[in-house]
Structure formats: C-alpha cells, structure tokens
Regions:
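Glycine-rich, low-complexity segments
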Residues: 1-2, 7-46, 161-164
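A detector of low-complexity, intrinsically disordered, Ser/Thr/Gly/Pro/Ala-rich segments
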Residues: 18, 40, 53-55, 148, ...
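Solvent-exposed, conformationally flexible loop/turn segments
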Residues: 35-46, 51, 56, 115-120
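Mid-length scaffold segments of soluble, non-membrane domains
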Residues: 76-78
C-alpha cells in the first residue's frame, strides 16, 4: 500500500505477512561499560563501548566510537545524548557537543555549570540533522575543573533515522 505520493507504507509478501517500511532504521543506543576520564579544558570523544542495540551495525563501539550512516540510508536523523561529568567545583562547566565528520557542530551544544563543589553536572541535548551516506557522528565532552574528571557510565548516546 502507498500514500498519495506513491511512497510505500507497507506491503505483503504474498503469504499474508505484512511488511512495514523501516522508517526509524537505523537506530542505536550506546553507553559506557565503565567510567571514562577526560582532561581539563579539552574536547574529548566519549568512547561509548557498549551497545544496547544497533540495528544496522552502524555504530563502531570498539575503534572509532561513532555512528556512520549506512549506504542508501541518508536522511533526517535525531540524536539524543547525556553525559554525567563528576565532581566539578562550584561554577565550573561541563559540556557536550556532537561532531559531524570530525568537525564540531556548533548548534545543539549543551553546557551545565556546577552549583556546588563536588557536584555532578548533567549535560544533555537533542539534535536533528540531515545526513548523507558515510557521514559520521560522534559525541564529545568538555570540562574546565582544572584537572582530569570522570564521565560516568550512566552517560548515553542514541540516534535514529526519522525520515528521508
């Protein structure tokens, strides 16, 4: 069956089994298997190494720690992310931002400031992007506490295709 513009909505395999279009594929959700240390005053890639799911094997959780758009699946994507940066001093900043093809994306960046010494900051955000096959997306974190700090394993990164 098709919509008014001829786009397939669902079909039958001829044996009575309905097959829907996988509009929200690929999708993934990744997290850290343990805490990660990040340096002071440096944007550092978060090395999400545990996959809760990865529908198209498009997230590399062992080498580059990034999502790559599979061939033929360019389109609109939604990414959601949270980084829990620990033990910052009062007024210090924790932040996250996406990188596209190795370059910082300057919109969708989330800054959080510690309200008391020793507090965790929760930097999170969502961003829709128009991507092409072979584009890749990574999540980076930043903190300015004066020494290395911890990104906790409760941090997550998710993404899914939401349309062509």
């Amino acid at each position: 069956y098709q919509d008014a513009n001829g786009n397939a909505l669902f079909s039958s395999d001829g044996s009575g089994n309905v097959q829907t279009q996988k509009l929200n594929y690929p999708s993934f959700r990744v997290r850290l298997s343990s805490n990660q240390s990040i340096s002071h005053d440096t944007w550092t890639k978060i090395q999400f190494n545990t996959e809760d799911w990865d529908t198209n094997t498009a997230y590399d959780n062992s080498t580059n720690y990034r999502f790559t758009v599979p061939t033929g699946l360019g389109g609109k994507y939604l990414f959601c992310y949270t980084a829990v940066i620990g033990d910052l001093n009062d007024g210090k900043r924790g932040a996250v931002r996406l990188y596209l093809n190795g370059n910082a994306v300057n919109y969708g960046r989330e800054n959080s400031y510690s309200s008391s010494t020793g507090a965790n900051t929760y930097s999170n955000g969502q961003l829709m992007m128009d991507l092409s096959a072979s584009d890749y997306v990574e999540l980076y974190a930043y903190q300015n506490n004066g020494d290395s700090q911890t990104i906790y394993s409760t941090s997550i990164f998710t993404g899914m295709r939401i349309g062509s």
